[in-house]
Amino acid sequence: MPIAAESLRLGPWRDGVNYSVPAEDLSPSGIHDMQNCTVGLAGEVSKRKGFVKFNSSAMNSGATVTALGQVTLAGAEKVFAFCGNKFFDVTGGSATDRTGSTTITAGNDYTWQWVLAGDTLVAVNGQDTDAIKWTGGSNNAAALDDDSRFTKPNHIAFWENRLWVGNTNTVPDRVWRSDAGDIETWGALNYHAFGYDVTGLSPFQSTLSVHTEQGIHTLTPTGNSTIPFSQQQRTQRGTIAGRTIVTIPGERQLFVREDGIYQWTGGPAVEKISFALDDGYWPNLNSARLPYSFALFYPAEEQVWFFLPFGASQTQMNSVVIYSNRLNCWFGPYNGFTRNAAAMIDELPHAGDFAGHIQKHETGNNDDGSAIKAFFETASLAPLGDAVQCRWLYNRTLFDNTGDFDLSVTQTSASIVSNVETIQMGDLGATLNTTFTLDASVL
């Protein structure tokens, strides 16, 4: 018989997740809680994709991956990784040791930042005396010639045809620049001092942005050979984690601070954009480990993945919250794994783990063979308003059958007994030529 009822539609969920507002106060397009789910362009929510090993055999006896990436060197596309005290060419998923005579100190926190400087890969980690360079092919890595101007730089950039490094072990507030067109020639006075420890470098618009925790400074070309760059402080806040600086379409620079995630568009102020993560998510992070967090821009989806330490005593990055530039909303976290570095390889997110592997994300429906536990919780709106208490609710849920799993739909509300309905999705591979199970197999 027909059901006499008022209709209350929840979704599409284009507002993403908001951990700072009670479920009762969210709009129908908001999400109260979620795990391992993604929000699509139509506002649909789906379980995230999984990951598989990029290199089947662990590098360096299962040491921690401290950097990875994909670059074109000598006309060939190369995948590389720093793992423990070694540097590897991992092109094609097979690791070849290219450490040579370079010194690489192993340690989970000795992560590398790298740039492609013309036809040379250059990387720094703030721990080893020299920056490391690699020209690809069958060559080994080697120490960068820096004319003995600095040691142990933490941050690096390539801009205006020059190599830039910042926060060296003796003068942490200084940024050095190479000669134009020559990354291994460094003048004795070719540096800029900023008064505070440099926390990150990133080209932005027509400038080089230099981050300190106390502000963002810019270096701008002057066209004058005597003073080739003018220096100016633009904001009163900068990042605490250099590996989280990401520039996205629309000329917006995103980065992490202790209280949240901010954006800078080039003006005199920065803006916090992660209010939706306050209260229910951000306070659970280990703030002491945020300087070791990192971020990755996923161009195909226009997403920024922030790898963060969830848990008061958590030291490794075990939680990924995602900002959608297209929807201007947040979703996540993704969890169930730990990562130490990330990069785009073959247009997909890849991340290094603590066991010598690069993991290829956004692939398959499981995590290297393990099931993904995912859920999301909608807003909790009163169907007839706050003044009316309903005794019965009729729930209709729409979903797509895309795999072999069970779908559970749970309803909870005040004064109404909670109910869980489990729908057995069955195996999409079931056909007339295989075993058919009533109420489970798909026709």
Regions picked out by a protein language model, each given a short descriptive name:
Residues 179-191:
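A short, charged helix-loop
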Residues 208-234:
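Surface-exposed extracellular loop regions of Gram-negative outer-membrane beta-barrel proteins
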Residues 111-146:
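Hydrophobic or amphipathic alpha-helical targeting/insertion segments
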Residues 151-179:
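Carboxylate/His-rich catalytic cores and anion/metal-binding grooves
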